């Protein structure tokens, strides 16, 4: 009987971002504009870093991977959301929901760990400059990338396995525009207290610890560069401030969503929209606009291949 109950729910009905047609149209247009303008910019960042021999430092290697992660992350939720805006009934299969949830946490977890790696890179570059070539050699950089991909995979697998073990026998309406843990787990027809604790530990605690660790590391870096020369200080300050902005934009919504009991709050959908759609598109752009070397290289690539 338990096995049958687990297979009763074969699809979920997404209630969407809002029931207002005017707001749906506005969000549809804004997200579409973001896609057509900023998403190609992310791929331009990747192409620029790959094609310019002058951008071989570990910072640019990680920035290229960040752009790739964000471009991939933006394909998980936004395209389906745009299609659903045009549909009267928004339905996602059980398997499709689990797949979306897996990639959401796989790429999101990997990106959070990548920001930790980038903070470590900046710490070594600014606080231990003489050791930088030795510590941040290509082999170490590739090992770090492999570790963060593996970390994101393990984090996501834990989320998915916990969901798959739950029976779903109705109702099947998800009060959101995509599948995520807080909404899906509430539809399980069993007590989920222990599972929620495990998920808060897996997602929320990891997010919070990474956030606090990143803030502490950049605080150390900022204290260290106070006595530097004016030019070096300004460049280091610019890089650190950019990273801190991205940290708040990424981890702020994550902490709000995953470090509390899985209850519905009025701001949930707006925070989720920013976290899953807007921020992944803007993230590499924020880095690029404050990096003179990347901007100069992008101009050369643009003039060479397009102008």
UniProtKB/Swiss-Prot annotation:
<dbReference type="GO" id="GO:0004930">
    <property type="term" value="F:G protein-coupled receptor activity"/>
</dbReference>
<feature type="topological domain" description="Cytoplasmic">
    <location>
        <begin position="220"/>
        <end position="235"/>
    </location>
</feature>
<keyword id="KW-0812">Transmembrane</keyword>
<dbReference type="GO" id="GO:0005886">
    <property type="term" value="C:plasma membrane"/>
</dbReference>
<keyword id="KW-0325">Glycoprotein</keyword>
<keyword id="KW-0675">Receptor</keyword>
<dbReference type="InterPro" id="IPR017452">
    <property type="entry name" value="GPCR_Rhodpsn_7TM"/>
</dbReference>
<feature type="topological domain" description="Extracellular">
    <location>
        <begin position="259"/>
        <end position="269"/>
    </location>
</feature>
<feature type="transmembrane region" description="Helical; Name=7">
    <location>
        <begin position="270"/>
        <end position="289"/>
    </location>
</feature>
<feature type="transmembrane region" description="Helical; Name=5">
    <location>
        <begin position="196"/>
        <end position="219"/>
    </location>
</feature>
<keyword id="KW-1015">Disulfide bond</keyword>
<feature type="topological domain" description="Extracellular">
    <location>
        <begin position="159"/>
        <end position="195"/>
    </location>
</feature>
<keyword id="KW-0472">Membrane</keyword>
<keyword id="KW-1003">Cell membrane</keyword>
<feature type="topological domain" description="Extracellular">
    <location>
        <begin position="1"/>
        <end position="25"/>
    </location>
</feature>
<feature type="transmembrane region" description="Helical; Name=3">
    <location>
        <begin position="101"/>
        <end position="120"/>
    </location>
</feature>
<feature type="topological domain" description="Cytoplasmic">
    <location>
        <begin position="121"/>
        <end position="139"/>
    </location>
</feature>
<keyword id="KW-0297">G-protein coupled receptor</keyword>
<feature type="transmembrane region" description="Helical; Name=2">
    <location>
        <begin position="58"/>
        <end position="79"/>
    </location>
</feature>
<protein>
    <recommendedName>
        <fullName>Olfactory receptor 4N2</fullName>
    </recommendedName>
</protein>
<feature type="topological domain" description="Extracellular">
    <location>
        <begin position="80"/>
        <end position="100"/>
    </location>
</feature>
<keyword id="KW-0716">Sensory transduction</keyword>
<keyword id="KW-0552">Olfaction</keyword>
<feature type="transmembrane region" description="Helical; Name=4">
    <location>
        <begin position="140"/>
        <end position="158"/>
    </location>
</feature>
<comment type="similarity">
    <text>Belongs to the G-protein coupled receptor 1 family.</text>
</comment>
<dbReference type="InterPro" id="IPR000725">
    <property type="entry name" value="Olfact_rcpt"/>
</dbReference>
<dbReference type="Pfam" id="PF13853">
    <property type="entry name" value="7tm_4"/>
</dbReference>
<dbReference type="GO" id="GO:0004984">
    <property type="term" value="F:olfactory receptor activity"/>
</dbReference>
<dbReference type="InterPro" id="IPR050427">
    <property type="entry name" value="Olfactory_Receptors"/>
</dbReference>
<dbReference type="InterPro" id="IPR000276">
    <property type="entry name" value="GPCR_Rhodpsn"/>
</dbReference>
<feature type="disulfide bond">
    <location>
        <begin position="97"/>
        <end position="189"/>
    </location>
</feature>
<feature type="topological domain" description="Cytoplasmic">
    <location>
        <begin position="50"/>
        <end position="57"/>
    </location>
</feature>
<feature type="transmembrane region" description="Helical; Name=1">
    <location>
        <begin position="26"/>
        <end position="49"/>
    </location>
</feature>
<feature type="glycosylation site" description="N-linked (GlcNAc...) asparagine">
    <location>
        <position position="5"/>
    </location>
</feature>
<keyword id="KW-1133">Transmembrane helix</keyword>
<keyword id="KW-0807">Transducer</keyword>
<comment type="function">
    <text>Odorant receptor.</text>
</comment>
<feature type="transmembrane region" description="Helical; Name=6">
    <location>
        <begin position="236"/>
        <end position="258"/>
    </location>
</feature>
<feature type="topological domain" description="Cytoplasmic">
    <location>
        <begin position="290"/>
        <end position="307"/>
    </location>
</feature>
């Amino acid at each position: 009987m338990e096995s049958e109950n687990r297979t009763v729910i074969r699809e979920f009905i997404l209630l969407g971002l809002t029931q207002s047609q005017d707001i749906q149209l506005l969000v549809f247009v804004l997200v579409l504009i973001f896609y057509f303008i900023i998403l190609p910019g992310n791929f331009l960042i990747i192409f620029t870093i790959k094609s310019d021999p002058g951008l071989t430092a570990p910072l640019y290697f990680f920035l290229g991977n960040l752009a790739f992660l964000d471009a991939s992350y933006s394909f998980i939720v936004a395209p389906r959301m745009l299609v659903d805006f045009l549909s009267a009934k928004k339905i996602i299969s059980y398997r499709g929901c689990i797949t979306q949830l897996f990639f959401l946490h796989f790429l999101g977890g990997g990106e959070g760990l990548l920001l930790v790696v980038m903070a470590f890179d900046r710490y070594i570059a600014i606080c231990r400059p003489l050791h930088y070539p030795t510590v941040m050699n290509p082999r170490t950089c590739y090992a770090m990338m492999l570790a963060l991909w593996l970390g994101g995979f393990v984090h996501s697998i834990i989320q998915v396995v916990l969901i798959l073990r739950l029976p779903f026998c109705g109702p099947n309406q998800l009060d959101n525009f995509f599948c995520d843990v807080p909404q899906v787990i509430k539809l399980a027809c069993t007590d989920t207290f222990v599972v929620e604790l495990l998920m808060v530990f897996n997602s929320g605690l990891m997010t919070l610890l990474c956030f606090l660790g990143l803030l502490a590391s950049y605080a150390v870096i900022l204290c260290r560069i106070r006595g530097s020369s004016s030019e070096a200080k300004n460049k280091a300050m610019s890089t650190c401030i950019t990273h801190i902005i991205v940290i708040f934009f990424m981890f702020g919504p994550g902490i709000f969503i995953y470090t509390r009991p899985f209850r519905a709050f009025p701001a949930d959908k707006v925070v989720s929209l920013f976290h899953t759609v807007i921020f992944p598109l803007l993230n590499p752009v924020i880095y690029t606009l404050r990096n003179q070397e990347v901007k100069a290289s992008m101009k050369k690539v643009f003039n060479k291949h397009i102008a």
